[in-house]
Amino acid sequence: MRHFARINGADADLWGAVGLLHDLDFERYPDMPTADPDVAALSHMLVTEGPISAQLPGHPFYGVAHLREHGWSAEVRRAILAHADYSGVHPESPMEKTLIAVDELSSFVIAVALVRASKSIFDVDVAAVKKKLKDKAFARAVNREDIVRGAAGLDISLDDMIQHVVTALRGDAERLGLQGVSPGA
């Protein structure tokens, strides 16, 4: 997210926070409701400052409610809701569209790096990622259609999107533990 914020001339800290926080409730509240008018109305309540008068149905609603309670902006809350296609919040801003685009792809690229003998993001390129995308057994929980739609939502090619994510992860390789291991380690 920070990489794409810099490309867009946006606040890298804000975009980075959205990237870190968007799934903060997923382990505890993994349920994802069906899209319907009630869910959309709840999303609207969570973005605005009005009272929340409905039961929270699961991810990402609990996380967004928590962020609202702790003073996070409507911009952040809306971006997090927009990444859930069932929330009724359609992505509009570059930050919202980018979160959707990198959500599945960044995890997928990390998985590609970690199955390499070197465990290094520096040994991952676009061709390696695309080859693994074709292997439906690899990282089977990752929704490939979401990856393709994410790139399209940013109006960039899938190859360019993958390259951006690889580049971003390389820039943070040490912190993410993706700099690799020594042979025989």
What is the meaning of each model-derived region?
Residues H3-I7, E69, D135, G153, ...:
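Residues at alpha-helix termini
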Residues R2-R6, A12, I156-D172, V181:
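Active-site hotspot residues in diverse enzymes, especially metal/ion-binding acidic/histidine motifs
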Residues A74, V89-H90, Q163, G171-Q179:
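Metal-centered catalytic cores of metalloenzymes
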Residues A128, K134-M161, L176:
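C-terminal binding/interaction regions
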Residues G184:
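Feature captures the catalytic cores and cofactor-binding loops of soluble hydro-lyases/lyases
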Residues N8-K136, V148:
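Divalent metal-dependent catalytic cores for phosphoryl transfer on phosphate-bearing substrates
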Residues S53-L56, E69, I156, D160, ...:
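N-terminal cap/leader regions of alpha/beta-hydrolase-fold enzymes
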